[in-house]
Structure formats: structure tokens, C-alpha cells
């Protein structure tokens, strides 16, 4: 990608964080000096760094980038049974105050909102809220999220009165 903007010797500096925001591993990957895709294989990372199953996030910093230097979000969720569906939202580190479109769970479903803090400072308790679309009654998440930590918020447990096809707004 960056090769098309004239970049050469592009490298990725990567840091893997666990769910609590602690560093699991750091390493550098060299990208080819040609137009090419690049994959980061989470199964290989787990083997290389002996992490076992975990929840966390991968911070990617692009070195020697020319032009556009944004790396978009990637989500990796494994489900051996094929019963898990994942989706992502734009991963800008500058959040809006309101996001919409998260579905309430249907009967027998579990919807998890993954809150990932991509900053070196905590997200304070009560600064994230959920509500039924259009409602002023807001559920506030009452825990801090540590720097670079991740938290899976169970939507059904947080808003048990809501169900599909209702939609949820996320207050940030």
C-alpha cells in the first residue's frame, strides 16, 4: 500500500497487549518494496510467543510510511463451531460522542461490544453509555478501562430489557 506512495523499507512495529493492557510481545515486520498485501497470522503469533488463547489488541505503528499512514482496524475472532459472527467499526483513535447501529440480542444470542482503549491513559468509569436508539435512559459502564486494555461488554446483561430488532446507541 505505502509503496504506491513512494515508500521504501517500510516496517511495522507491533505490540501485542492482553486484556488488562499488559504487553505480551513486541516485534518488527518488514514489508516488501512492492505493491503487496500483508497478513498477520494470529495463530502463528500465538505459537511464536506462546500466548495460548487470550483477549487483547495489537498496536501497529508504520515506520517509513509516505502519504497515507492510517492502519485500519482488524478483528480476529475464532469459533471452531462457526456460530460466531464478528464485525468491526472504524478504528479511529478519536472517538465521536455517539455511535449507532449495534443490534440488541435476539433470543438465545449473545452480543458483545468490545471496548478497546488504544490510548496510554485510562477510559474513566461512566464515560461510556448504552441506550435504546432514541431513548434518553442511558446505561453507564461503571468500570475504568486501563491503558491499552480491552473489555467485552455483554449487551444482554447490560440492557436486559432490549431485544432484537431494537438497536442500541453507544455514548462515548
What are these regions (language model features)?
Residues 1-172:
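Gly/Pro-rich, tryptophan- and cysteine-flecked surface segments typical
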